[in-house]
């Protein structure tokens, strides 16, 4: 029931309401023809107002075709594109890798600084012992090199010379 009433309501909106002929005044057939002509004028005016201009029609067609083309391209290239989840996973793994690399660099920097401090301390310690040895050696009477207890002297290391000789062979033809 509601669908028929909706159809009647739609048709009533589209059509101009008919005028009733007063009793006995005019010809019913002439009045009906006049009403049909007026109704056609009303419908033509309605269509003219609702119809898009040629420019608007062409523009809307171009937009719809572009959307359709973009959809086809997206479908065709979908297997080569990464989804949002894939991109998030890639970004997350990249961030984790950068974080680990940064931690490793920090660790290496701290260890390098500690190593340099220890190296300086050992060099300072070695320098102080070598300075005292030199002082003790040069400070002895008669210029002799006598050893004093508790002072280490550097022992000369044997020098090794290695020479490589080429064997001269002549190839006979």
Swiss-Prot record:
Biological processes per GO annotation: double-strand break repair via nonhomologous end joining
Subcellular location: Nucleus; Chromosome, Telomere
Main location class: nucleus
Chain positions with N-acetylserine modification: 2
InterPro entries to which the protein is assigned, alphabetical: FAM192A/Fyv6_N (IPR019331)
Entry's Gene Ontology cellular component terms: chromosome, telomeric region; nucleus
Domain of life: Eukaryota
Family that this chain belongs to: Belongs to the FYV6 family.
Task of the protein: Involved in telomere length regulation and required for survival upon exposure to K1 killer toxin. Promotes fully efficient non-homologous end-joining (NHEJ) by a mechanism activated in postdiauxic/stationary phase.
Protein name as annotated: Protein FYV6
Organism: Saccharomyces cerevisiae (strain ATCC 204508 / S288c) (Baker's yeast)
């Amino acid at each position: 029931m509601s669908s028929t009433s909706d159809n009647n309501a739609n048709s009533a909106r589209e059509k101009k309401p008919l005028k009733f002929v007063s009793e006995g005044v005019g010809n019913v057939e002439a009045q009906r023809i006049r009403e049909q002509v007026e109704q056609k004028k009303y419908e033509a005016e309605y269509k003219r107002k609702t119809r898009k201009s040629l420019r608007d029609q062409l523009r809307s067609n171009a937009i719809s075709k572009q959307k359709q083309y973009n959809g086809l391209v997206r479908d065709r290239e979908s297997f080569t594109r990464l989804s949002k989840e894939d991109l998030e996973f890639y970004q997350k793994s990249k961030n984790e890798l950068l974080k680990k690399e940064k931690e490793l660099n920090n660790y290496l920097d701290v260890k390098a600084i500690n190593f340099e401090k220890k190296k300086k301390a050992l060099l300072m310690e070695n320098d102080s012992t070598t300075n005292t040895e030199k002082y003790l050696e040069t400070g002895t009477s008669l210029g002799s090199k006598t050893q004093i207890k508790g002072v280490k002297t550097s022992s000369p290391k044997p020098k090794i010379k290695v020479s490589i000789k080429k064997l001269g062979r002549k190839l006979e033809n």
